[in-house]
Amino acid sequence: MLARSALFVHSAELAANAARAASGAAAAQPKKTGNRIKTFEIYRFNPEAPGAKPTIQKFDVDLDQCGTMILDALIKIKNEVDPTLTFRRSCREGICGSCAMNIGGENTLACICKIDADTSKSTKIYPLPHMFVVKDLVPDMNLFYAQYASIQPWIQKKTPLTLGEKQMHQSVAERDRLDGLYECILCACCSTSCPSYWWNADKYLGPAVLMQAYRWVIDSRDDYAQERLHRMHDSFSAFKCHTIMNCTKTCPKHLNPAKAIGEIKSLLTGFKSKPAAEPSAF
């Protein structure tokens, strides 16, 4: 009985030591000795760990051995220090919007955000604010994408069309109206910087989705502008925007969601109307 108890205690000690070693493995890293060592404070959260709570973990990166962008540092940390660090990324060119996160207090894309070369200050990296976190720097985008789907982002016609029978032409002026709208990459930087979206995401569509809604409302080839506007004619969908302008300030593509929302409000209140489609010259 005593031997069995001793064996149990010894096994428990081994398990505890193993747990401590595992928890410290991610934090352990070689001491950097270069001249340009930059500290990154990164949000960590693993929902699969029992009783998991968010923490901030520090990583030191030698900038002389790293690329110039935040995403370069994250990839270096994941490849060389902690393979459990989780984040989204794809194009590395500011096109796909996958690597959107909060860097130094501002929402932006990690692939086009340059590392602050001032090594006396650390750089703080968090997931996009006010969204559920899947793991580490990966936010849950399900609600955002569902809202995007709700605006039916495709051309809708009231006249029957046979694919390939004819083209839907636009004049130069009609096409110009889409500039500054279609370039949105749906990264959600603007929506997650908006206080109205923080507190009313279940009802307020948010800057990114509203800008895309306006893009389809104003498209001269679309015949369902009134129906699209009708779906937004309530107290929350568009009018919850209080023109704080965070969305326009933070957009990594330098678009102006606030202006698009203002145009939607003008259409909803009757101050403006959608221009009639120009007769085709083709």
Curated annotation (Swiss-Prot):
Positions bound to [4Fe-4S] cluster: C184, C187, C190, C251
Cofactor annotation: [2Fe-2S] cluster; [3Fe-4S] cluster; [4Fe-4S] cluster
Residue numbers binding [2Fe-2S] cluster: C91, C96, C99, C111
Keyword Nucleotidyltransferase attached: no
Membrane topology field: Peripheral membrane protein
Top-rank EC class of the record's enzyme: oxidoreductase
One Pfam family named in its UniProt record: Fer4_17
Transmembrane feature ranges: none
Superkingdom of the organism of origin: Eukaryota
4Fe-4S ferredoxin-type domain residues: 174-204
Keywords for this protein: 2Fe-2S, 3Fe-4S, 4Fe-4S, Electron transport, Iron, Iron-sulfur, Membrane, Metal-binding, Mitochondrion, Mitochondrion inner membrane, Oxidoreductase, Transit peptide, Transport, Tricarboxylic acid cycle
GO cellular component: mitochondrial inner membrane; mitochondrial membrane; respiratory chain complex II (succinate dehydrogenase)
Limits of the 2Fe-2S ferredoxin-type domain: 43-131
Cofactor note as given: Binds 1 [2Fe-2S] cluster.
Catalytic activity: a quinone + succinate = fumarate + a quinol
Gene Ontology molecular function terms on file: 2 iron, 2 sulfur cluster binding; 3 iron, 4 sulfur cluster binding; 4 iron, 4 sulfur cluster binding; electron transfer activity; metal ion binding; succinate dehydrogenase (quinone) activity; ubiquinone binding
Binding residues annotated for [3Fe-4S] cluster, in chain numbering: C194, C241, C247
Family: Belongs to the succinate dehydrogenase/fumarate reductase iron-sulfur protein family.
Functional note: Iron-sulfur protein (IP) subunit of succinate dehydrogenase (SDH) that is involved in complex II of the mitochondrial electron transport chain and is responsible for transferring electrons from succinate to ubiquinone (coenzyme Q).
Assembly information from the UniProt record: Component of complex II composed of four subunits: a flavoprotein (FP), an iron-sulfur protein (IP), and a cytochrome b composed of a large and a small subunit.
Protein name: Succinate dehydrogenase [ubiquinone] iron-sulfur subunit, mitochondrial
Name of the gene this protein is made from: sdhb-1
